[in-house]
Amino acid sequence: MSMSQSALIKEEISSVSFQFYTSDDVRKLSVKQIVEIESFDMLGGPVPGGLHDPALGPTGPAERCATCSLDFIECPGHFGHIELAIPCYNPVSFQTIFKLLKNKCFHCHHFKHGKPIINQFIEELTLLFKGDVVKARNLRERNVLLRGYEEKKKGKSNEEGEEVMESDESDSDKMDTDENKTNGKIICDGVFNAKEIYSGKATHIEDFKREVFKEFFGSFSGYAIPCGNCGAYSPRLRNGDASKSKLFIMPLHDKYATKNSAIKLPTNFSSVKEQTEHGTWFAPWEVLDNMKKLFENEKEILDMLLGHLVPIVTNKGGAKKNVGRQFTKESNVDSLFMRVFPVTPARYRPPNFVNGRRSEHPQNSHYKGMVKSNKMIRQSIDAGEGKAKFLVNSVCDLQMHVNNMYDNSKSNSNTNEVANGIKQILEKKEGLFRKHMMGKRVNYAARTVISPDISLETNEMGVPQYFAKTLTFPQPVTSFNYNQLAQAVINGPEQYPGANFIEDENGHLINLSKESQEKRIALSKTLLTSHPHAPRGVNKKVYRHLLSGDYVLANRQPTLHKPGIMGHRVKVLGKNEKTLRMHYSNCSTYNADFDGDEMNIHFPQSLLASAEIREICANNYQYLVPRNGAPLRGLIQDHILTGVLLTKRDTLFTKADFQAILYASCWSVNTKHPIVTPPPCILKPVPLWSGKQLISAALNQLTIGRAPLNLEAPSKIPTKMWGTKGLEITRDSHVIIRQNEMVAGILDKGHFGASSYGLVHTCYELYDPDVAGSLLTLLGRMFTNYLQSRGFTCGVDDLLMKNKEEKFRVETLKKANEEGYTVAAKFADLSKYDEQKARDFFSKALQSEREVARLDGLLKKGLNQYTSKVIDTLIPGGQQKPFPKNNFSLMTVSGAKGSVVNFSQVSCLLGQQELEGKRVPRMVSGKTLPSFQAYDASARAGGFVMDRFLTGVRPQDYFFHCMAGREGLIDTAVKTSRSGYLQRCLIKHLEGLSVQYDNTVRESDGSVIQFNYGEDSLEIGKTPYLTKFPIIAENYELFKSQFPMEQLIEQLKNQEVVEYNRSIKTQPELDPVMSKFNPSSDLGCVSESFMNQLNHYIESNPQKLIKTTSNRDGKINEKDFRNLMYLYYSRSMVSPGESVGLLCAQSIGEPSTQMTLNTFHLAGRGEANVTLGIPRLRELIMTATTKPITPLMEFQINDSTNKVETEKMAKYLEILKLSDIIKDITVQEYFQDTNRNYDIEIEFIPTLQQVLSLHRIKEKQLNKLFGEFNKVIKRQVKSQGKLKVNNGDIGLGSKVRGSDLVEDDSLTINDDDAPANDDTTNNDENTSQQQPSSQNKKSKSKVITQDDDSVAAKSKNKKKQNVNYEDGEEEAEEKDSDEGESEAEESDDKSDVDSDSDEISNSRSSNSFSDESIEFDQKKLTFTISVASDSKKVLMLGIVETEASKFVLKSCKGITRCFVNEKQVGGKTHYSIQSEGVNLSEIFELRDKLKIDEIYTNDIYAILQKYGVEACRQAVTSEISNVFAAYGISVDKRHLILLGDYMTFEGGYRALNRIGIENNTSPFQKMSFETTFSFLSKASLMGDYDTVTSPSSRIVLGQIVKNGTGSFTIVAPVK
């Protein structure tokens, strides 16, 4: 091994540019042309000129290279090449060629844009490449206006069929000269220096560049656009077979051929004289000729668009000289085509041996295909004209093989045997990028099962000796460690502690396992002697075994957040141990348990890495979780229980026991000082020590030489558990520690578990992390020792209840079962429950999901009261054994294990079983299980389990319970992958965000995302105690001892800040102090909220500790306290280099694994669905959707306490369908003459007039709507029977929404809202002028769809409704396909909506029906439909019911239903309206009736469109926060603010997916995310480059990431 790990690196890659190899490049690279199809001859030797020619390098260990004469290990391999018989398209750039051809003129071979417009684009791009994005954008805005003017002018002259007027020509000339002038000013000479190139890589520039490219290639690619230079019309091109990259040139349309011949220009642009209507094959060599001419004529703009960076070399005095770091952009037509194909070295295509027979590498098939096609083409060319068709096929075959080499997915072959292309090798998880270049596998790592060990310290890791002998560290030999390392060399690899290798000064390794004892002794003596030819200043190194005291990284997968990898101090275990050992307190950090989990350890190989692990990464420093700053480490289960038992009042010890426990816990702490036993707390009859004294003694031992601790904090166990008599302080529920003496309270999970503001957390903050770690170790040992003598168990008597409470339980549960019948009667509108009537009602009503949900809601609400009543009465008051004697109760209350839910399931009842948030579903028969009756209304039949585990669960109830359990298991399995991908998207986008030395948060390209991290520059882990002023004031001396206070104040004091803070008090309108000064260097420059809280504390002075004018007895001077808090703020600031982007991604990704997957949750009063959990996070973050699954708004009317008016407004905004006002439908069928007649009678609900007045629909409009409905029915009958309907014509009118026919002005809807549910009208009068009927129907048949179940439930039909699910889906599909509706149609809609109903009735009169056809009064509507008697019979009732459930009488676009919610504010009930669907424009129209400044909506895109990007940013933050809050998960707002800032940084709403990463400036980062091949192709085509600043790109190139400790370099002083 000649290369040493410590070899000095003299150069590193600072940037990488991407481009294609040209034919000349490939020829220079190649050592051999491949011409033979066969690779091996009959004897198995390589064929010269074949794919395994010896010149390409050896393929096996026994061979030597014919080119460089090196063996298999040393030879890197050499490229070959295949000369293609004809030029082929580069598969990557085929689409670009197609775009260029569409934009070029086939007559003058320029772009069709014309010179002035081309110059505009050149100007914009030059400014952009210089990095001046502001000037470029301003120029672009001006140019876009100019371009619009030019196009209009052109369009006019073309329409009139006239030549362009002379004046216009002179205008354009003048403009051209103007452009050239500015051109000269801006463009200079197309030379860019390295600084400009770096500054040209920014997110906004990438975004702008994409805009320009899109416009350039999109604006003139149309077929009917004449050339801006010569006025010629060019033919249309057709893109043929994708696998063979074929192009066809279509004949010129007669109209344009005439125009061309009029100005004496050609009309046939193909080499073939007779063209078919399908077009002529456009041969690649013809395309190449065309492209060459284009690249010659349009060099300047093409260099900008497709050029790659080329260093400028001058040729002074005959010698080539590189000019500084200057570059120019050059494009090359050769990069779009392939004349030569490179062949990879033979070592990368080794033959496979199966059963002794050699088979070639799959990739060879692509090369062979090319060689074969080459030969065919040459033969066809030699044969002449007769083989033309044969030639075309061979050319296509050659192109296909070239394409397959790049990407085999486009192959025509149906078999899966096509070898992988380059795309398949690079992409996906197993591809080159993600599996290899991003770094996955490492050396010096070990993995085995983990097991707990209580005698280890919390920061230690027990490592088996087997691992310790294999993992080594390269220790440089010095005079200080010579003896130790010499002994290690003598011991050798087998005897521990020994060494495995010695590395000499030249980097050569000596393997000690092959050396004898004598040789090892001899080698040990030469460790300090240096070789005469060795480089100076280099020591020998001994690869010694892993020793106790070394630091390793430990990791458990999945590593969801930063503490998933932590540093541990090694404790090497005995010979026979086989598992890794660790302390219990690390379990919650790694999310580990000991049921077979495995973990990895990594041994760092440099002293620098070891130092970072010890000082930054060590697990004592990972006490707080970055997600919200809460503690993560703590003692668990048995320890928590023992903590309660040890510190409660009646626990007393003799001197021997006390000292035994105290020594067992403190033997390793401050070992230079004796352990002091305090005086006993009880002297007579015998001296006894309490458990609280053990804690006091341990604290005294731990804090020797430091100020003692003062603490007051509540315990987790509630006060009521200790009884209700006496003072609260006598009930041990509040811990009080004074000067290290524990005087009251008990220690439980709240103090040494993973809980905030407890004893351990306070020690972590007031002393240091190592003290907190030692305290956890000490308490763990203490509790274990006590538990060994005390013991703990749990018996059946812990679970029993008193007789009185048992009776209460039985009676309450009887009532609960009857509650099912009560609710059912109420639901069915019966005065009392009648089984038959209820069953009939339920059999119809429960067909609708909406009604099932309503019944579930009512029953759950009723039954929950009974469940709560039973549990509250029985626990803890009804237990036979009271707390704390009751061990089961002790477990659940102290937080050791289990909860009240577990206790209640054992002793009270199991309660309501739910599946996906609903009660147990019914089968088709109406039963929940075969053992219950159909539509049984009892609570038990619906899954309410009244049994408990103590006395047994009946089979039916057990089955329900198992159903609910199974759902949880499936949920866990499914959500893992969903949340995993979500976290990956977050990580790849946010990885480059870090804090800089000016306190800003920047992307790796230097773009500023935030000016202060989280708006206050504070680190989340340092903020928990920042505003806990009482604790800091009580421990003032202890806290003060952490800082060299006077010295720091002197350094950081700034009088200007003091003055500014004073003036803010009197002038609150001034800017915050943080916007004027630097918080990291100016004392007192703190956030507004911190300043306000500090001022409030000092003014109120609750503990009277601060010395003020009103309180002279205080201990602490106000000025000193203020300065201390300012220093604390400075110390709590986020460190420069912190990877806040990664922390944000982990803090959102990690808790998402705890969410359940169930999508819907009932919001508000329990009727409107909202998406929650991972699906909601995905639509907010990953897709940044413009149409959320469940959009909703919430708003109030001006008088929000008025329930009646609120309900009226809710009704007014709701959609009203015909089925909502129908009571009954009857159809009579009879024959008359030669017709079959259907008399249809629709009976309306009695409250029709009230409904119509609420929705503001007039009778005149209703008549019109019924006429429309009649037409809809006829059209349905016609389509079902495919027959002619006799009564009058059927108009082409489609489904109609009522808002088209309602005259109320307030329902004028603007179309600038997100088109969530776009409904459009169809005017029958206009059908003759519109497109053919089929197209018309397609483009104008959008109806607000709603799940049909709800419609069925709301209509009061006596007949069973025929709900058709497929219809809903089809409509949804149709809606999607119609998204690109033209603006003209939209403006039509507006005029339709706004028009007066009288005009509508006039406009429709030409096609309306006579009064005999429809009869309508207040109670019913009748009409007749006639069809020919020989026609197929149709189910008329079904048609009418289905169409009535779809026919919209009135709607407010986007809003389907509204609910009224109520909440109590200041003793008053306030009502708000919650709508399903969002339409902000409509709400704005009603601003005189609604509180317009108090609208809430969860549709972020609608907020962006209406309120702008700042509101959008706030909405993103609050919506994500709401998703987590629903699951009780807290994520610090700083993470959410950062994510909101990142997503809205570009001024829009950016998705965290592959579309959102498009504007990222690092091609490597994009490639390592997704669609590697696509991003690589784009980078090569555009001549992109990577400045190697993003973490991904640095990892790809094997460099240290520039975040954290990599964000600076350490320079040694040179003396």
UniProtKB/Swiss-Prot annotation:
<dbReference type="Pfam" id="PF04997">
    <property type="entry name" value="RNA_pol_Rpb1_1"/>
</dbReference>
<feature type="region of interest" description="Disordered">
    <location>
        <begin position="1305"/>
        <end position="1411"/>
    </location>
</feature>
<feature type="compositionally biased region" description="Acidic residues">
    <location>
        <begin position="160"/>
        <end position="171"/>
    </location>
</feature>
<dbReference type="Pfam" id="PF04998">
    <property type="entry name" value="RNA_pol_Rpb1_5"/>
</dbReference>
<dbReference type="InterPro" id="IPR000722">
    <property type="entry name" value="RNA_pol_asu"/>
</dbReference>
<dbReference type="GO" id="GO:0003677">
    <property type="term" value="F:DNA binding"/>
</dbReference>
<keyword id="KW-0460">Magnesium</keyword>
<dbReference type="InterPro" id="IPR045867">
    <property type="entry name" value="DNA-dir_RpoC_beta_prime"/>
</dbReference>
<dbReference type="GO" id="GO:0046872">
    <property type="term" value="F:metal ion binding"/>
</dbReference>
<feature type="compositionally biased region" description="Low complexity">
    <location>
        <begin position="1400"/>
        <end position="1411"/>
    </location>
</feature>
<comment type="subunit">
    <text>Component of the RNA polymerase I (Pol I) complex consisting of at least 13 subunits.</text>
</comment>
<feature type="binding site">
    <location>
        <position position="68"/>
    </location>
    <ligand>
        <name>Zn(2+)</name>
    </ligand>
</feature>
<feature type="compositionally biased region" description="Basic and acidic residues">
    <location>
        <begin position="172"/>
        <end position="181"/>
    </location>
</feature>
<feature type="binding site">
    <location>
        <position position="595"/>
    </location>
    <ligand>
        <name>Mg(2+)</name>
    </ligand>
</feature>
<dbReference type="InterPro" id="IPR007081">
    <property type="entry name" value="RNA_pol_Rpb1_5"/>
</dbReference>
<comment type="similarity">
    <text>Belongs to the RNA polymerase beta' chain family.</text>
</comment>
<feature type="region of interest" description="Bridging helix">
    <location>
        <begin position="955"/>
        <end position="967"/>
    </location>
</feature>
<dbReference type="InterPro" id="IPR038120">
    <property type="entry name" value="Rpb1_funnel_sf"/>
</dbReference>
<protein>
    <recommendedName>
        <fullName>DNA-directed RNA polymerase I subunit rpa1</fullName>
        <ecNumber>2.7.7.6</ecNumber>
    </recommendedName>
</protein>
<dbReference type="InterPro" id="IPR042102">
    <property type="entry name" value="RNA_pol_Rpb1_3_sf"/>
</dbReference>
<dbReference type="InterPro" id="IPR006592">
    <property type="entry name" value="RNA_pol_N"/>
</dbReference>
<feature type="region of interest" description="Disordered">
    <location>
        <begin position="155"/>
        <end position="181"/>
    </location>
</feature>
<dbReference type="GO" id="GO:0003899">
    <property type="term" value="F:DNA-directed RNA polymerase activity"/>
</dbReference>
<dbReference type="InterPro" id="IPR007080">
    <property type="entry name" value="RNA_pol_Rpb1_1"/>
</dbReference>
<feature type="binding site">
    <location>
        <position position="65"/>
    </location>
    <ligand>
        <name>Zn(2+)</name>
    </ligand>
</feature>
<dbReference type="InterPro" id="IPR047107">
    <property type="entry name" value="DNA-dir_RNA_pol1_lsu_C"/>
</dbReference>
<dbReference type="Pfam" id="PF05000">
    <property type="entry name" value="RNA_pol_Rpb1_4"/>
</dbReference>
<dbReference type="Pfam" id="PF00623">
    <property type="entry name" value="RNA_pol_Rpb1_2"/>
</dbReference>
<dbReference type="Pfam" id="PF04983">
    <property type="entry name" value="RNA_pol_Rpb1_3"/>
</dbReference>
<feature type="compositionally biased region" description="Acidic residues">
    <location>
        <begin position="1366"/>
        <end position="1399"/>
    </location>
</feature>
<feature type="compositionally biased region" description="Low complexity">
    <location>
        <begin position="1317"/>
        <end position="1336"/>
    </location>
</feature>
<dbReference type="GO" id="GO:0005736">
    <property type="term" value="C:RNA polymerase I complex"/>
</dbReference>
<feature type="binding site">
    <location>
        <position position="597"/>
    </location>
    <ligand>
        <name>Mg(2+)</name>
    </ligand>
</feature>
<keyword id="KW-0479">Metal-binding</keyword>
<keyword id="KW-0862">Zinc</keyword>
<dbReference type="InterPro" id="IPR007066">
    <property type="entry name" value="RNA_pol_Rpb1_3"/>
</dbReference>
<dbReference type="GO" id="GO:0006360">
    <property type="term" value="P:transcription by RNA polymerase I"/>
</dbReference>
<feature type="binding site">
    <location>
        <position position="593"/>
    </location>
    <ligand>
        <name>Mg(2+)</name>
    </ligand>
</feature>
<keyword id="KW-0240">DNA-directed RNA polymerase</keyword>
<dbReference type="InterPro" id="IPR015699">
    <property type="entry name" value="DNA-dir_RNA_pol1_lsu_N"/>
</dbReference>
<keyword id="KW-0548">Nucleotidyltransferase</keyword>
<feature type="compositionally biased region" description="Acidic residues">
    <location>
        <begin position="1305"/>
        <end position="1316"/>
    </location>
</feature>
